[in-house]
Regions:
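Glycine- and acidic-residue-biased ligand/ion/polar-headgroup-sensing regions
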Residues: 40-53, 57-58
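Short beta-strand segments
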Residues: 33, 59-61, 103
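Short acidic-glycine-tyrosine-enriched beta hairpin
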Residues: 58-76
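Double-stranded beta-helix
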Residues: 1-5, 78-114
């Protein structure tokens, strides 16, 4: 299965079709993804295990196992794992016209990525 390790954890690509892309994302304890948005895709997140702390357009939301959230195109968002010991695992379904990693516009990033 194709995937990539990142400073905050790892993702695996479960499906990569022309009209959608599906990833299984694991966020290590006390890590978070960048605060970002996308020009060409929306995202649906479903929590598999752990507690997700989501920021969506500056609003804080907590999601537990089996909870989900929709991230519209252009919406600023981030997800964080506040657990000190357990991984956060969620499924991300991307819908849109382009799914390249270069459609990530980072507003803030703990790892100084652009």
């Amino acid at each position: 299965m194709e995937g990539e390790t990142r400073p905050w954890g790892r993702y695996e690509i479960l499906s990569d079709a022309q009209d959608c892309k599906v990833k299984r994302i694991t966020v290590k304890p006390e890590q978070r993804l960048s605060y970002q948005y996308h020009h060409k895709r929306s995202e649906h997140w479903v929590v598999v295990s752990g507690i997700a702390h989501v920021v969506l357009d500056d609003v804080d939301i907590e999601l537990g196992e089996d909870d989900s959230i929709y991230i519209p195109v252009g919406a600023k968002h981030r997800i964080k794992n506040n657990s000190k010991t357990e991984d956060l695992v969620f499924i991300e379904v991307q819908c849109g016209t382009y799914f390249g990693e270069d459609d990530i516009v980072r507003i803030t990033d703990d790892y100084s990525r652009e």
